[in-house]
Amino acid sequence: MNRREFLKCGAACGALASAGCATGDAARSAAAVGKSGDCPFRLGVAGYTLVNFKLDESLKMLKTWDVGEFCAKDFHYPLKASAAELRELVKKTSDFGVHLYGAGPIITKTEDDARRAFDYCATLGVPTLVGVPAEVFDASKGWAGNRSSRKMCEVCARLADEYKINFAIHNHGANPKTGNPNLYPTVETTADLITDLSPRIGFCVDIAYTHADGFDPSAILRKHAARVFDVHLRNVAVADNGSSGAAADKGVIDYVRIFRTLKDIGYSGVCGLELANAYGKPSEANPGADPSWVPRSIGYFRGLMDSI
């Protein structure tokens, strides 16, 4: 499927998402944008979902899908842009009826990196920085050569207090084929590094990786409720290492229970759909990769939000 075909698909499926209709047993009629019924949290889209599209295209798709929450990524809102340039991009985003709820994930390896990231978030006007405070132990390995850093966690916790911006560490999975076992693989390994630090440093809980690593996502959300600042949503076709993408209503993760848990703990942030693998070519890992997964998943999740 080329870009033009995808955009046509997105427009057609957007009507499904906006109406809140979705296939699958758990689908329900949905409310309007973001918050549904008395559900305390909102539905958004993580920037990485639209990594293959320019900002204008992405904003048009979000408008088509009637999604009003978006997480900024560097390829849409460049980290190296001037403050004036970033403010122009924020205005453009707002003109499409879209609100930036956070930024990241952003890897920070030095205090200068971290301060630059916080300055970026302050200019964007977002309350949450999704980050990966890291140190390099083997530069030849690229991403795999980074590992968790207590020192950088301390730096980011201090800056979170200074800027009054929450810092949410993203778990990237313990399986070396799909994640990095040395770099905040799970929420629990991250918790060991931060629970004595500022309450402004916490978690961006990736539900699929949490499930793939053998944890009960609902139990993790309850245990760490006070430090959950962001949640990434995607589903997997089978109970594997977290790589087999699926539309939300076709996977194996129990999102009905997870959404009820989020409501029970009073989570009032955004749950961001992160489904970039839907835009890849079908493969053994993604045998049914299909761009319609995104609007279809939006409709499904809205239905769940309306039903809980």
Region annotations inferred by a language model:
Residues 80, 139, 281:
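Glycine/Thr-rich phosphate-binding loops of Rossmann-like dinucleotide-binding domains
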Residues 71-88:
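Glycine-rich, proline-tolerant flexible connector loops at the mouths of alpha/beta enzymes
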Residues 41-46, 70-72, 100-105, 129-131, ...:
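Hydrophobic faces of well-ordered beta-strands that scaffold small-molecule active sites
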Residues 4-16, 20-42, 51-63, 184-205, ...:
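Histidine-acidic metal/acid-base catalytic patches
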Residues 10-16, 35-37, 56-57, 63, ...:
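Active-site acidic/histidine proton-transfer and metal-coordination neighborhood
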Residues 47-53, 74-79:
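Extracytoplasmic "Venus flytrap"
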